[in-house]
Amino acid sequence: MQEQNPIVLMNFSGIYREEEFWKNRQVSWIELQDVCGTNCYCDEEAIAEINKRTENYPTAGIHFIDSGNYHYMTRLWLTRMDQPFCLLVYDNHTDMQPPAFGGILSCGGWIAAALEELENLKYVILVGPDEAAYEQVDENLKDRVIFLSREKLQVMNDEERNWFLRETVSEVCNWRKSEGLQEDAEKFLPLYISVDKDVLCTEDAQTTWSQEIGRASCRERV
Protein backbone atom coordinates (compact mmCIF):
# COMPACT_ATOMS: atom_id res chain seq x y z
CA MET A 1 0.00 0.00 0.00
CA GLN A 2 1.28 3.45 -0.93
CA GLU A 3 1.45 6.29 1.61
CA GLN A 4 -1.90 7.24 3.11
CA ASN A 5 -4.01 10.05 1.62
CA PRO A 6 -1.86 10.61 -1.47
CA ILE A 7 -2.54 12.90 -4.38
CA VAL A 8 -2.90 10.50 -7.28
CA LEU A 9 -2.73 11.54 -10.94
CA MET A 10 -4.13 9.01 -13.38
CA ASN A 11 -2.62 9.73 -16.78
CA PHE A 12 -4.94 8.53 -19.55
CA SER A 13 -4.59 11.29 -22.16
CA GLY A 14 -1.25 12.95 -21.44
CA ILE A 15 -2.88 16.26 -20.48
CA TYR A 16 -1.18 16.44 -17.08
CA ARG A 17 2.21 16.76 -18.74
CA GLU A 18 1.01 20.12 -20.08
CA GLU A 19 -0.25 21.37 -16.70
CA GLU A 20 1.64 22.88 -13.78
CA PHE A 21 -0.62 22.53 -10.73
CA TRP A 22 0.95 19.29 -9.50
CA LYS A 23 4.62 19.79 -10.32
CA ASN A 24 5.69 21.25 -6.97
CA ARG A 25 3.71 18.70 -4.95
CA GLN A 26 4.32 15.15 -3.89
CA VAL A 27 2.07 13.08 -6.12
CA SER A 28 1.67 9.48 -7.18
CA TRP A 29 1.65 9.14 -10.98
CA ILE A 30 -0.25 6.18 -12.45
CA GLU A 31 0.57 5.73 -16.12
CA LEU A 32 -2.44 4.53 -18.15
CA GLN A 33 -1.95 6.14 -21.54
CA ASP A 34 -0.87 2.82 -23.02
CA VAL A 35 -4.05 1.00 -21.92
CA CYS A 36 -6.45 0.48 -24.83
CA GLY A 37 -10.23 0.60 -24.53
CA THR A 38 -10.53 3.46 -22.02
CA ASN A 39 -11.79 6.56 -23.85
CA CYS A 40 -15.38 7.23 -22.66
CA TYR A 41 -15.97 3.47 -22.43
CA CYS A 42 -13.94 0.97 -20.43
CA ASP A 43 -13.99 -2.67 -21.47
CA GLU A 44 -13.31 -5.63 -19.20
CA GLU A 45 -9.72 -6.05 -20.30
CA ALA A 46 -8.99 -2.39 -19.60
CA ILE A 47 -10.71 -2.59 -16.20
CA ALA A 48 -8.52 -5.53 -15.22
CA GLU A 49 -5.36 -3.67 -16.21
CA ILE A 50 -6.42 -0.46 -14.44
CA ASN A 51 -7.26 -2.37 -11.27
CA LYS A 52 -3.86 -4.04 -11.41
CA ARG A 53 -2.04 -0.71 -11.69
CA THR A 54 -4.06 0.97 -8.93
CA GLU A 55 -4.31 -1.90 -6.45
CA ASN A 56 -1.60 -0.55 -4.12
CA TYR A 57 -3.20 2.88 -3.74
CA PRO A 58 -5.77 3.63 -1.02
CA THR A 59 -9.29 4.85 -1.71
CA ALA A 60 -8.75 7.79 0.62
CA GLY A 61 -7.03 10.82 -0.81
CA ILE A 62 -7.40 13.03 -3.87
CA HIS A 63 -7.59 11.30 -7.23
CA PHE A 64 -7.22 13.31 -10.42
CA ILE A 65 -8.71 11.04 -13.07
CA ASP A 66 -7.90 13.01 -16.25
CA SER A 67 -10.82 14.39 -18.30
CA GLY A 68 -14.54 13.75 -18.00
CA ASN A 69 -14.10 10.96 -20.56
CA TYR A 70 -12.70 8.90 -17.69
CA HIS A 71 -15.18 9.82 -14.95
CA TYR A 72 -16.08 6.13 -14.78
CA MET A 73 -12.86 5.74 -12.77
CA THR A 74 -14.85 6.86 -9.74
CA ARG A 75 -16.90 3.68 -10.12
CA LEU A 76 -13.71 1.60 -10.02
CA TRP A 77 -12.38 3.38 -6.93
CA LEU A 78 -15.73 2.90 -5.19
CA THR A 79 -15.46 -0.87 -5.61
CA ARG A 80 -12.85 -0.80 -2.86
CA MET A 81 -15.13 0.74 -0.24
CA ASP A 82 -15.46 -2.04 2.33
CA GLN A 83 -18.19 -0.42 4.43
CA PRO A 84 -21.47 1.40 3.74
CA PHE A 85 -20.95 4.90 2.33
CA CYS A 86 -22.61 7.76 0.46
CA LEU A 87 -21.54 9.50 -2.73
CA LEU A 88 -21.69 13.23 -3.51
CA VAL A 89 -21.28 14.05 -7.21
CA TYR A 90 -20.91 17.46 -8.84
CA ASP A 91 -21.56 17.03 -12.55
CA ASN A 92 -23.18 18.83 -15.46
CA HIS A 93 -24.65 15.49 -16.60
CA THR A 94 -26.49 12.70 -14.77
CA ASP A 95 -24.02 9.96 -15.72
CA MET A 96 -26.95 7.56 -15.35
CA GLN A 97 -27.58 6.81 -19.00
CA PRO A 98 -28.19 3.21 -20.05
CA PRO A 99 -25.11 1.75 -21.76
CA ALA A 100 -25.05 1.92 -25.55
CA PHE A 101 -22.98 -1.27 -25.83
CA GLY A 102 -24.39 -3.93 -23.54
CA GLY A 103 -23.16 -3.65 -19.98
CA ILE A 104 -19.88 -1.89 -20.71
CA LEU A 105 -18.81 0.74 -18.17
CA SER A 106 -18.98 4.30 -19.51
CA CYS A 107 -18.44 7.90 -18.49
CA GLY A 108 -22.14 8.51 -19.16
CA GLY A 109 -23.48 5.64 -17.07
CA TRP A 110 -21.07 4.98 -14.21
CA ILE A 111 -23.37 6.32 -11.46
CA ALA A 112 -26.15 3.98 -12.58
CA ALA A 113 -23.67 1.10 -12.59
CA ALA A 114 -22.54 1.98 -9.07
CA LEU A 115 -26.12 2.12 -7.77
CA GLU A 116 -26.96 -1.22 -9.36
CA GLU A 117 -23.80 -3.10 -8.46
CA LEU A 118 -22.34 -1.75 -5.22
CA GLU A 119 -24.14 -3.02 -2.14
CA ASN A 120 -22.27 -0.63 0.15
CA LEU A 121 -23.41 2.46 -1.75
CA LYS A 122 -26.46 3.70 0.14
CA TYR A 123 -27.24 7.10 -1.40
CA VAL A 124 -26.05 9.41 -4.16
CA ILE A 125 -26.32 13.19 -3.86
CA LEU A 126 -26.22 14.52 -7.42
CA VAL A 127 -25.67 18.25 -7.94
CA GLY A 128 -25.69 20.00 -11.30
CA PRO A 129 -27.58 18.32 -14.18
CA ASP A 130 -30.66 19.97 -15.65
CA GLU A 131 -34.13 18.76 -14.78
CA ALA A 132 -34.88 17.50 -18.29
CA ALA A 133 -31.86 15.18 -18.18
CA TYR A 134 -32.82 13.84 -14.76
CA GLU A 135 -36.35 13.07 -15.98
CA GLN A 136 -34.79 10.51 -18.34
CA VAL A 137 -33.17 8.57 -15.50
CA ASP A 138 -34.59 5.13 -14.68
CA GLU A 139 -37.17 5.57 -11.91
CA ASN A 140 -35.80 2.53 -10.07
CA LEU A 141 -32.53 4.39 -9.52
CA LYS A 142 -34.10 7.56 -8.18
CA ASP A 143 -35.09 6.01 -4.84
CA ARG A 144 -31.49 6.34 -3.68
CA VAL A 145 -30.66 9.65 -5.34
CA ILE A 146 -31.04 13.14 -3.86
CA PHE A 147 -31.00 15.57 -6.76
CA LEU A 148 -30.26 19.30 -6.92
CA SER A 149 -30.83 20.58 -10.43
CA ARG A 150 -28.97 23.22 -12.40
CA GLU A 151 -32.13 25.33 -12.50
CA LYS A 152 -32.41 25.39 -8.70
CA LEU A 153 -28.71 26.05 -8.27
CA GLN A 154 -28.94 29.12 -10.47
CA VAL A 155 -31.55 30.78 -8.22
CA MET A 156 -30.00 29.79 -4.89
CA ASN A 157 -27.56 32.00 -3.05
CA ASP A 158 -24.43 30.68 -1.35
CA GLU A 159 -26.15 30.35 2.01
CA GLU A 160 -29.00 28.31 0.54
CA ARG A 161 -26.64 26.02 -1.35
CA ASN A 162 -24.52 25.46 1.74
CA TRP A 163 -27.62 24.73 3.82
CA PHE A 164 -28.89 22.19 1.30
CA LEU A 165 -25.59 20.33 1.19
CA ARG A 166 -25.04 20.43 4.93
CA GLU A 167 -28.53 19.15 5.75
CA THR A 168 -28.62 16.57 2.96
CA VAL A 169 -25.22 15.10 3.74
CA SER A 170 -26.08 14.97 7.44
CA GLU A 171 -29.33 13.14 6.71
CA VAL A 172 -28.09 10.52 4.25
CA CYS A 173 -24.84 9.83 6.07
CA ASN A 174 -26.78 9.11 9.26
CA TRP A 175 -27.95 5.87 7.62
CA ARG A 176 -26.76 3.64 10.46
CA LYS A 177 -29.08 5.36 12.89
CA SER A 178 -32.03 5.16 10.49
CA GLU A 179 -31.37 1.45 10.01
CA GLY A 180 -31.62 0.86 13.75
CA LEU A 181 -28.07 -0.38 14.17
CA GLN A 182 -26.39 -0.56 17.54
CA GLU A 183 -25.83 2.76 19.27
CA ASP A 184 -22.13 2.14 19.62
CA ALA A 185 -21.80 1.79 15.85
CA GLU A 186 -20.08 4.64 14.07
CA LYS A 187 -22.79 7.26 13.63
CA PHE A 188 -22.00 8.69 10.23
CA LEU A 189 -21.17 6.96 6.98
CA PRO A 190 -18.10 7.95 4.97
CA LEU A 191 -18.78 10.41 2.15
CA TYR A 192 -16.97 9.99 -1.18
CA ILE A 193 -16.92 13.18 -3.28
CA SER A 194 -16.53 13.17 -7.06
CA VAL A 195 -16.25 16.40 -9.07
CA ASP A 196 -16.48 16.54 -12.86
CA LYS A 197 -14.50 19.48 -14.21
CA ASP A 198 -17.48 20.53 -16.35
CA VAL A 199 -19.09 22.15 -13.28
CA LEU A 200 -16.15 24.54 -12.87
CA CYS A 201 -15.63 27.93 -14.46
CA THR A 202 -13.51 27.95 -17.59
CA GLU A 203 -10.77 29.88 -15.77
CA ASP A 204 -10.20 26.82 -13.57
CA ALA A 205 -10.89 24.09 -16.12
CA GLN A 206 -11.63 24.00 -19.83
CA THR A 207 -13.34 20.85 -21.02
CA THR A 208 -14.71 19.40 -24.23
CA TRP A 209 -18.07 18.94 -22.46
CA SER A 210 -20.80 21.55 -21.91
CA GLN A 211 -20.16 23.81 -18.91
CA GLU A 212 -23.52 25.56 -18.49
CA ILE A 213 -23.26 25.78 -14.70
CA GLY A 214 -19.51 26.21 -14.78
CA ARG A 215 -19.45 29.64 -13.17
CA ALA A 216 -18.03 28.61 -9.83
CA SER A 217 -14.41 28.28 -8.93
CA CYS A 218 -12.97 25.00 -7.72
CA ARG A 219 -12.82 26.41 -4.19
CA GLU A 220 -16.51 27.41 -4.27
CA ARG A 221 -17.68 24.02 -5.55
CA VAL A 222 -15.68 21.83 -3.23
Predicted stretch roles:
Residues 2-221:
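Conserved alpha-helical scaffold segments that buttress catalytic/binding sites
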